[in-house]
Regions:
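Catalytic cores of histone-lysine modification enzymes
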Residues: 1-61, 85, 98, 104
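C-terminal SET catalytic tail plus cysteine-rich post-SET Zn-binding segment of SAM-dependent SET-domain
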Residues: 47-147
């Protein structure tokens, strides 16, 4: 059974995760309206701080990719696979579970998440500091207060 699960992951990662992108457009009530396959979109890399964004037209199922910042010639085009509102741990775990890689981008590498402190907890001991992971790329990292 374990071999079957591993085989499914390899197939999913190879053919769905990188060769084909399956996206579900939603209607005004956020209900899925179907699926679309976007093979060119699928070659774009993920970065939590990306240089492009995508939108879907739910009526035509057309996908549009637009630059969020200036993209220099030869620079990789990247999009976010998940919401930027999720904290590092949740986002990285979902990326690992769904796309089978560990994101190590600038935001994921920074315990403060580029100053957003999305994952930070208020310190119970001092009430003025934030508790953050010591190593945000380590899933089992210890956390400590910033003060």
């Amino acid at each position: 059974m374990i071999i079957v699960i591993q085989l499914i992951r390899v197939i999913r990662s190879t053919f769905i995760g990188s060769a084909i992108c399956s996206v579900s457009p939603v209607d005004i009530n956020r209900q899925p309206e179907g699926k679309g396959l976007y093979p060119i979109f699928a070659i774009m890399s993920h970065y939590c701080i990306c240089n492009a964004r995508y939108t879907l037209n739910p009526k035509s199922l057309s996908m549009y990719v637009r630059a969020r910042s200036n993209i220099r010639k030869g620079e990789e085009i990247s999009v976010q696979y998940l919401s930027a509102l999720s904290g590092n741990f949740k986002r990285r775990r979902k990326i690992r579970d769904e796309w089978y890689f560990d994101c190590e981008c600038r935001r994921c590498s920074d315990p403060t998440e580029c100053g957003s402190y999305v994952s930070a907890l208020k310190c119970d001991s001092c009430s003025s500091g934030n508790v953050l992971p010591i190593d945000s790329l380590e899933y089992n990292s210890k956390w400590k207060c910033t003060t």
